[in-house]
C-alpha cells in the first residue's frame, strides 16, 4: 500500500540510494539540502503564511521509496508555491502524478493560490506529467546564458546601490510594468516579494539586491539580483524599464565586479525571461556578445480555485421581468 509523508532523517539513507545516478556535484548538494530539511521540524508546524523553508514529501510502497517532491513557498508571498524537485523511479509516471496532486490538494487547502514549476524543455516525460497529467499550463520560458569570456564594449559600471525594503513597492511596480500583458495575471509580484525577510540567514541560498535610479528624478529604472547556492555559481537577474536606454554592458560589469569582490574563481550566468517587454532586445544583445544559452526552462503554472458552495433551495422571485435570487 502506498502512502505519502513528510521526509524525516530516517528516510535519508534510502533517498541517497535513489539519487546515486545524479552527477557528483548535484548529489552532494541535494543530500546536504535534504539533511538540513529533515533536521528542522519547526517549518512544518507553522501555518502557511509563516512558512519559509523547503518541505519534502516522499511516496513509499511498504519500505521502498517510489518518489519525492520538494516545494518552497515564495519569499514574501507564501501562497505562491514553487515545486523545485520531483524525482520518481523510471517508468513510475503515476508516482510523480500522485505527488504533484498531493501537493496541490494539501497546500491548496491551506490557502495556496498558485503553483509553479520550471521544467527543462528537454524533459519530455516531466513536461507531459505537469501539462497533461496535472493540469498545469505553460506560460513562457526562462533561459540561462553563461557569461564565460564575456568581453564588454563599454568598460563603465552602472551606478547601482543596495536595495532597501523601502524600495519594494517601486521594484514590484517596475517588474510588473515590464511583463507582457498576456502573462501579467500569472507572473505579477507583490511588494513583499522584494523585501528582505527576517529569516534570510536560514534559507539555502544567498542573494544580493540592487537598484538603479534616474539621477534626475530618483525613479528606480532597473533592479538587479545576484543569487548563489554554493558560492561558486552565481545567477544574475535583471529587470529594466524599457523607456530608458540602459547599457547591459554597464549592468553586467557592475554585477561581475560585485561577485569578484567576494570570489576570485566563480562561474557567472545571466537569466533571460522571455515574458518581458525587453526580452527580444536583451536576447539580441546576448547573441551579439557571442554568449551561449546553456539551459531553457518552461514556466508552468497552475492556479488553485476552491469550489464555491452553492446555496440550495433558492427562492426565485420574478418582478417586472427581472430575476432576483
Where are these regions (language model features)?
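Amide-forming acyltransferase catalytic core, primarily the GNAT-like/NAT-type
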Residues: 2-66, 135-232
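Long, hydrophobic/aromatic-enriched structural stretches that serve as scaffold segments
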Residues: 58-98, 103-104
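A structural feature that tracks compact, well-ordered secondary-structure segments
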Residues: 70, 102, 118-120, 129, ...
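Internal, hydrophobic cores of structured domains that mediate oligomerization or house catalytic pockets
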Residues: 106-107, 113-151
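Conserved GNAT acetyl-CoA-binding A-motif
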Residues: 107-120, 262-275
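Active-site/acyl-donor-binding loops of N-acyltransferases
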Residues: 133-154, 265-325
Amino acid at each position: 500500500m502506498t502512502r505519502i509523508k513528510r521526509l524525516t532523517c530516517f528516510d535519508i539513507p534510502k533517498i541517497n540510494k535513489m539519487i546515486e545516478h545524479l552527477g557528483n556535484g548535484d548529489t552532494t548538494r541535494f543530500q546536504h539540502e535534504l539533511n538540513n530539511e529533515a533536521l528542522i521540524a519547526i517549518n512544518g508546524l507553522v501555518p502557511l503564511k509563516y512558512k519559509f523553508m523547503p518541505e519534502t514529501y516522499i511516496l513509499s510502497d511498504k519500505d521502498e521509496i517510489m518518489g519525492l517532491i520538494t516545494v518552497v513557498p515564495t519569499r514574501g508571498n507564501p501562497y505562491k508555491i514553487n515545486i523545485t524537485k520531483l524525482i520518481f523511479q523510471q517508468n513510475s509516471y503515476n508516482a510523480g502524478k500522485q505527488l504533484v496532486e498531493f501537493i496541490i490538494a494539501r497546500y491548496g487547502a491551506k490557502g495556496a493560490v498558485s503553483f509553479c514549476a520550471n521544467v527543462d524543455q528537454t524533459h519530455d516525460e516531466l513536461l507531459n506529467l505537469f501539462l497533461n497529467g496535472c493540469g498545469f499550463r505553460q506560460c513562457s520560458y526562462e533561459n540561462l546564458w553563461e557569461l564565460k569570456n564575456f568581453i564588454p564594449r563599454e568598460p563603465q559600471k552602472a551606478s547601482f546601490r543596495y536595495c532597501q525594503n523601502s524600495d519594494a513597492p517601486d521594484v514590484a511596480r517596475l517588474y510588473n510594468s515590464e511583463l507582457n500583458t498576456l502573462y501579467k495575471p500569472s507572473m505579477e509580484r507583490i511588494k513583499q516579494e522584494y523585501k528582505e525577510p527576517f529569516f534570510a540567514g536560514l534559507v539555502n541560498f544567498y542573494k544580493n539586491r540592487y537598484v538603479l535610479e534616474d539621477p534626475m528624478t530618483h525613479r528606480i529604472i532597473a533592479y538587479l539580483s545576484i543569487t548563489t547556492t554554493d558560492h561558486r555559481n552565481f545567477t544574475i537577474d535583471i529587470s529594466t524599464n524599457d523607456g530608458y536606454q540602459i547599457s547591459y554592458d554597464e549592468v553586467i560589469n557592475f554585477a561581475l565586479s560585485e561577485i569578484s569582490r567576494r570570489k576570485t574563481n566563480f562561474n557567472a550566468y545571466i537569466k533571460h525571461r522571455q515574458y518581458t517587454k525587453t526580452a527580444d532586445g536583451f536576447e539580441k544583445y546576448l547573441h551579439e556578445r557571442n554568449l551561449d544559452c546553456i539551459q531553457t526552462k518552461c514556466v508552468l503554472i497552475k492556479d488553485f480555485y476552491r469550489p464555491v458552495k452553492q446555496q440550495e433551495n433558492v427562492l426565485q422571485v420574478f418582478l417586472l421581468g427581472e430575476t432576483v435570487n
